[in-house]
């Protein structure tokens, strides 16, 4: 947790999307679990911290989805070729299975090509964030 840093404008982006009625989901590859760098409990602790900090500002993160797998990982139970590791759409599709979401109203913002590919594979819009204010980036997406 001590190494975690918020992306510029991230908190206010979460607040804006919450105020506009969006359900916010985080989908993240966590190959460090498969590599033995940290545990799933560590990932869950970080996610609880992030959600708690966001809530202090009035933002609500609906759910975190994470993939602990890596085909070439050093921890055997996580060293698998799964359907959830981005660019595969498994985590996004799981959110659609668990929540009543309209694909045409959903979008994903990610900082890597795999994020956008996962969004496209799931049938939603994906946007590549490459730095600067995430809030301004998101406002431009919402403007259409």
Show the residue positions of the predicted features.
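Basic, amphipathic juxtamembrane/active-site segments
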Residues: 1-12
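Short coil/turn segments at secondary-structure junctions
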Residues: 1, 33-34, 79
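Substrate-recognition element of Asp-dependent hydrolases with the DxDx(T/V) motif
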Residues: 10-47, 61-70, 119
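Asp-based, Mg2+/Mn2+-dependent phosphohydrolase catalytic module
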Residues: 40-63, 72-108, 112-144
């Amino acid at each position: 947790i001590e190494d975690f840093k918020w992306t510029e404008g991230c908190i206010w982006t979460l607040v804006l999307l919450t105020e506009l009625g969006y359900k916010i989901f985080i989908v993240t590859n966590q190959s460090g679990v498969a590599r033995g760098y940290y545990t799933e409990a560590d990932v869950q602790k970080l996610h609880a911290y992030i959600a708690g900090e966001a809530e202090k500002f009035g933002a609500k993160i609906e759910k975190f989805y994470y993939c602990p797998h890596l085909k070439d990982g050093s921890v055997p139970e996580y060293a698998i070729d799964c359907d959830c590791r981005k660019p595969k759409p498994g985590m996004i599709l799981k959110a659609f299975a668990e929540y009543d979401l309209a694909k045409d109203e959903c979008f994903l913002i990610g900082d890597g090509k795999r994020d956008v590919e996962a969004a496209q594979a799931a049938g939603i819009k994906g946007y590549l964030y490459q730095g600067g204010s995430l809030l301004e980036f998101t406002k431009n997406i919402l403007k259409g």
